[in-house]
């Protein structure tokens, strides 16, 4: 019994030691001129972009009148993105399909890459590679891009009259309406970042404590959650664009 107890205590201590070694926020930088560039995000983002560009080349290469399985898949993805855009934006959704589609596909592939690609085997001088959306810099950039898009959508349709929405239905709500536009990118970025980071940390902790087979259901749940987060981000982005063009809250 003493031997068994000692073995269990040793395993627990080793597991807790490994968990304590899990680091968040360690970064690897490139020095370019007088600037420090966050290399981890760039490397993983380039990989995701390469996957998307490669898929696009495959999708448009040699299209068939009778679609093949691969062509059917890409057409299904395109129709899905169109449906999301049309539902949220309305009749003028057409010009925004590429933007919403790019957001959705980049976030979706980025999220899944954290679970499916073996980033950890690539050794860096400092830090480690992870999904691009595992970094707050990426999610904030995507959220700010969305903010620019819905401001552009409103201004391009209504001109300076777009800003009249801030005093509707009453000028008393001006501070609240302004604050709402600041909270939109914050909620988009932190929701995506928090969910992806938490998912990866949960898997790391479980793998440290229990055999590899046990965390597999959690990993599948993480894949499902990652897809949902991409859909939520793209849907909200389309909704904000539609809202700015319609001029109501």
UniProtKB/Swiss-Prot annotation:
The keyword Cytoplasm does not apply. GO terms for cellular component: chloroplast thylakoid membrane; plasma membrane; proton-transporting ATP synthase complex. It is a multi-pass membrane protein. It is found in: Plastid, Chloroplast thylakoid membrane. Keywords: ATP synthesis, CF(0), Chloroplast, Hydrogen ion transport, Ion transport, Membrane, Plastid, Thylakoid, Transmembrane, Transmembrane helix, Transport. The chain crosses the membrane at residues 40-60, 97-117, 136-156, 201-221, 222-242. Belongs to the ATPase A chain family. HAMAP family: ATP_synth_a_bact. This is ATP synthase subunit a, chloroplastic. It comes from Barbarea verna (Land cress). The lineage of its organism: Eukaryota, Viridiplantae, Streptophyta, Embryophyta, Tracheophyta. The gene is atpI.
